[in-house]
Amino acid sequence: MDVREAIQQEAGAETGFASVTFNQDESCFSCANEQGFLVYNTFPLSLKLTKEFKQTPERGAGIGYSQMLYRTNYIALVGGGQRPRYSLNRVVIWDDLQQKESFSLKFMSIVRKVVLSRVHLVVALENELFIYSFHSTPKLLCPPIKTAPFGPFDFKVVTIEGKATDQAKVTSLLAYPSAKLTGQLHVADLSKLRSNQNNNQDMALTSESFLPTTIIKAHKAPIRNVRINNQGTMVATASRKGTLIRIFSTHNGILLKEFRRGLDRAEIYDMCFSPLGTRLAVVSDKQTLHVFQIAPMAEGTLNPANPEDHQSSGSNGHIKANTNQVHSLRNIVPTSWKPKYLDSVWSMCKVHLRNPKLRNNVNDLAFNEDRCTIAWCRQNRSHTFKNGNHFNENEENKLVLVWKNSRIWEKYVILEKEAPNSNDGIKGPSPLTEWELVRESWREL
């Protein structure tokens, strides 16, 4: 007879998080674990909520995925871990104020991801997206949307401020890879979703009959990552090859920017637009964080509502020109001989990510396998552009990374390098501004 006791986790020892997700405005993030979930304030970092479910012989407490609804008391949960609280094919909306389940949805396969808004609830399975109304009795708004197997998707709620006499317009954008054509992206405006009055008859139709989409030919390889900016004007994509990042207009699908991460293949596992959409942060399995400059950042010049304006990268008076890096031979080699590689645009700054708990840049193999989630720090103080857009330069310069397995929170800042002094007396074009990413602080969670 085996009388050995089960190995118990040592007191004070912590396991990694099953998932880390930021809320819709990136002011908070939730972490799912074997006991339940935690909620932190992004910046300044502080623990806001700890929820530990009670385990029984019949039922565990593990949560595999959690997603907040802004800073409300509602949070979407999916079971996970060694002893899941809920089945892996079930989505539960937890009301932390009432300390009970508000409602739940059950599916035929494992739930990969859930996103929320005050109006919609989107659930991702292996190759399908389900769009429901966010209500105590949720209604399926259209037939399931077929996507590429395990394909990424992004969902963004955009508020467009009207004139003094007009009400603000709220729209919801959904971007997902095509199930039929490799590298093709669909962008849908859920405000154009046709009303489904007859569930039994209408569900026999395809999702295209309910939801028109903008089709973008993004890559030749399968799409690995998709992100929509906060203004809903741009969508960034990366393929499984991981060498190029492309940014398209959500209005007409035209290519606005193309950036090069590197020459070798890499898995780009997270991307994030800055609050104003002037920069894009990208992290890959090379454990390198890149920041790309999309548009000049100067008071009174940026209009996120017109992404086509971002194609201009020249310098105009006090406006800082594009600060991304380019090849030194770009303007030397004749166009007729020049390979496309020489026209590539690299990041404005990058940093190799290392475990902050280790000194002397020791290579940590476990940390190299870890994955982080990116967000940008937002602050209350800001001033306003002449065109009415709120602007805070600090919001475009500060990033937060949260690591799943290591349970580490890091804050990075983008700093301008000092320009070298020129004493030769020769006047010429101003050198390209150089930037660097510096870790400002970190904490264990």
Swiss-Prot record:
One Gene Ontology MF term: phosphatidylinositol-3-phosphate binding
Coiled-coil region list: none
Principal place of residence: membrane
Biased composition (Polar residues): 312-321
Compartments where located: Vacuole membrane; Cytoplasmic vesicle membrane
InterPro entries: PROPPIN (IPR048720), WD40/YVTN_repeat-like_dom_sf (IPR015943), WD40_repeat_dom_sf (IPR036322), WD40_rpt (IPR001680)
Swiss-Prot/TrEMBL keywords: Cytoplasmic vesicle, Membrane, Protein transport, Repeat, Transport, Vacuole, WD repeat
Keyword Transmembrane attached: no
Assigned protein family: Belongs to the WD repeat PROPPIN family.
Domain notes: May contain a beta-propeller domain involved in specific binding to phosphatidylinositol 3,5-bisphosphate (PIP2), leading to the association of the protein to the membrane.
Function description: Involved in mitochondrial or peroxisomal functions and amino acid signaling pathways.
Protein name in the entry: SVP1-like protein 2
Organism: Candida glabrata (strain ATCC 2001 / BCRC 20586 / JCM 3761 / NBRC 0622 / NRRL Y-65 / CBS 138) (Yeast)
